[in-house]
Curated annotation (Swiss-Prot):
Keywords annotated in UniProt: Amino-acid biosynthesis, Branched-chain amino acid biosynthesis, Cytoplasm, Leucine biosynthesis, Magnesium, Metal-binding, Transferase
Cofactor(s) required for function per UniProt: Mg(2+)
Protein's name according to its UniProt entry: 2-isopropylmalate synthase
Origin organism lineage: Bacteria, Bacillati, Actinomycetota, Actinomycetes, Mycobacteriales
Organism: Corynebacterium glutamicum (strain R)
Catalysed conversion reaction: 3-methyl-2-oxobutanoate + acetyl-CoA + H2O = (2S)-2-isopropylmalate + CoA + H(+)
PROSITE patterns: AIPM_HOMOCIT_SYNTH_1, AIPM_HOMOCIT_SYNTH_2, PYR_CT
């Protein structure tokens, strides 16, 4: 057995299918029977039931309004993390969800975790919950857990108590070893207890949610029986409805069958006018979004999920994808995604999981065209939109503000990237390292540096080199130390001693510079001229045999006040090597000149090899 095989249950071997073809398989279909153990698995109609709904109506429905959203990142998402969120990360996530516009947020499982209990108490006691936001807490149908849950929520204005028990055939038989009546009694006993305990907390606006967990593995007739019994106990009204959540706890079948089961419940459950029908799709088969959309068309009112699809196993349904799918159809999602990079960075920081490059709407590559024909079509599409605003114009002649009210019609781009805070990216060379968003977020929020997008790839590779060599995680301080060492503190082969710039802002007259430097250990003074300070400095460095070509330049204020600092970023090709340089100084001019020196030293310092921009 090879070393690689030691980590799997059998030797790694792919067997090319050579078995018989299916009966009636067309001659043009050359697929052959495989050795996969298909006999071990049952179709859904055998394992659970065959749901028959020949008069289904959902295929003719359209999504025209957004559902009631409920974000479960802080509970379902958090419990699935290798490293569950710290209190600080939970606060960041909660604040993000509120800022985006979520009005129902599941904040934890306070009876199961002291950390969750403490977080619920914190956001209540610190008055962090807006009046129009309802927190949701999960609890199993057990008395001591229910009482603990109410203790956690004391003092909150609006709370949904979400109680559940599993009703599926498999869990009834294997996990609980209970019959149908016993499982139903678990649910109704919990409902009665919750209703009784709530009377001890009259200052809170209590709402109720019940989930027959593993609904997709439950016979719909029995699911209705349990739901009806719980609803009868809770006695909701049209003015004060309760939530019945029908989770695809494990996605077991195609989205159309899930939609049939939702429409069946929508039609048949008792007291439908007093029920908010909710969906909670998972993504085990990779069709969570489709299941949610079809289930919503089938009669649901509400959808639970996580940002970017975090959650157990393959995750919960992605609320970002769902909401922005609606936006592409002209439906207001009633959530804000105008800065999806910030949303992504915050979620990556909180979850310590990166959002994949191909994730809809938010991945690094989703608005990128690598194919030449795709690039051409995108460019022509943008030009055509510009011509609608100004006949004869192309995309470079019209600002985004002028295009913003124009209907979006660009090939290969289902949404205007700028509507979610992205750019019109033609080709981006993306480093394979993960964590660009997280690195950029920490550098921005903790250190005031808005690293240019293309530089983020380079710096994330620098950070990864350190973690590969030293192991462990890189915290905020360590990240700053890495950044300073890589970009700010190099003094070889060029160290700036003094710079004098003249005519930096004068029109029609070249800028000039006198630079006192230490070059390869020797004091030197060089002069230069150019159409700006950077060009003048490049001209001066040329006299030392250093060829500098500035290819990209970015700058911003890092701090404000009397001791304000500016940060500048320069992408330069230095003696044929393309690198980024960074400068921080009290003025933007001197920060920019420092950035050039930084790039020079990163390109030429033989003792400290730099990561090259673009990996070249």
């Amino acid at each position: 057995m090879s070393p690689n095989d030691a980590f799997i249950s059998a030797p790694a071997k792919i067997e090319t299918p050579v078995g018989p073809r299916n009966e009636g398989q067309p001659a043009w279909n050359k697929q052959r029977g495989s050795s996969m153990p298909v006999n071990r698995y049952m179709p859904f109609e055998v394992e659970v039931e065959d749901i028959s709904l020949p008069d289904r109506t959902w295929p003719d429905k359209k999504i025209t309004v957004a559902p009631q959203w409920c974000a479960v990142d802080l509970r379902d998402g958090n419990q699935a993390l290798i490293d569950p969120m710290s209190p600080e990360r939970k606060r960041r996530m909660f604040e993000l969800l509120v800022q985006m516009g979520f009005k129902e947020i599941e904040v934890g499982f306070p009876s199961a975790s002291q950390t969750d209990f403490d977080f619920v108490r914190e956001i209540i006691e610190k008055d962090m919950i807006p009046d129009d936001v309802t927190i949701q807490v999960l609890v199993q149908a057990r008395e001591h857990l229910i009482r603990r849950t109410f203790e956690a929520c004391e003092g909150a204005k609006n709370v949904i108590v979400h109680f559940y028990n599993s009703t599926s055939i498999l869990q009834r038989n294997v996990v609980f070893r209970m019959d149908k009546d016993q499982v139903k009694k678990l649910a109704t006993d919990a409902a009665e207890l919750i209703k009784t305990i709530a009377q001890d907390y009259p200052d809170t606006n209590w709402r109720w949610q019940y989930s027959p967990e593993s609904f997709t593995g439950t016979e719909v007739e029995y699911a209705k029986e349990v739901v009806d019994a719980v609803v009868e106990v809770m006695d909701p009204t049209p003015e004060n409805p309760m939530i019945i959540n029908l989770p695809s706890t494990v996605e077991m079948i195609t989205p159309n069958v899930y939609a049939d089961s939702i429409e069946w419940m929508h039609r048949n459950v008792n007291r439908r006018d007093s029920i908010i029908l909710s969906l909670h799709p998972h993504n085990d088969r990779g069709t969570g979004v489709g299941a949610a959309e079809l289930g919503y068309m089938a009669g649901a009112d509400r959808i639970e999920g996580c940002l970017f699809g975090n959650g157990e196993r393959t995750g919960n349904v992605c609320l970002v994808t769902l909401a922005l799918n609606m936006l592409t159809q002209g439906v207001d999602p009633q959530l804000d995604f105008t800065d999806i990079r910030q949303i992504r960075s915050t979620v990556e920081y909180c979850n310590q999981l990166r959002v994949p490059e191909r994730h809809p709407y938010a991945g690094d590559l989703v608005f990128t065209a690598f194919s030449g024909s795709h690039q051409d079509a995108v460019n022509k599409g943008l030009d055509a939109m510009a011509a609608k605003v100004k006949p004869g114009a192309n995309s470079t002649d019209v600002s985004w503000e002028e295009l913003r009210d124009t209907e979006w019609e660009v090939p290969y781009l289902p949404i205007d990237p700028k509507d979610v805070g992205r750019d019109y990216e033609a080709v981006i060379r993306v480093n394979s390292q993960s964590g660009k968003g997280g690195v950029a977020y920490i550098m921005k929020t903790d250190h005031g540096l808005q690293i240019p997008r293309s530089m983020q790839v380079e710096f994330s590779a620098v950070v990864q080199n350190v973690t590969d060599a030293e192991g462990g995680e890189v915290n905020s301080k360590a990240m700053w130390d890495i950044f300073a060492t890589e970009y700010l503190e190099r003094t070889a082969p060029v160290e700036q001693i003094a710079l004098r710039v003249e005519n930096a802002q004068t029109e029609n007259e070249d800028a000039s510079i006198t630079a006192e430097l230490i070059h390869n250990g020797k004091d030197v003074t060089v002069d230069g001229h150019g159409n700006g300070p950077l060009a003048a400095y490049a001209n001066a460095l040329e006299k030392l045999g250093i060829d500098v070509e500035i290819q990209e330049y970015n700058q911003h204020a890092r701090t404000s006040g009397d001791d304000a600092e500016a940060a500048a970023y320069v992408l330069a090709e230095v003696n044929g090597r393309k690198v980024w340089g960074v400068g921080i100084a009290g003025s933007i001019t001197y920060a920019s000149l420092k950035a050039v020196t930084s790039a020079v030293n990163r390109a030429l310092d033989v003792n400290h090899e730099a990561v090259l921009a673009g990996g070249v």
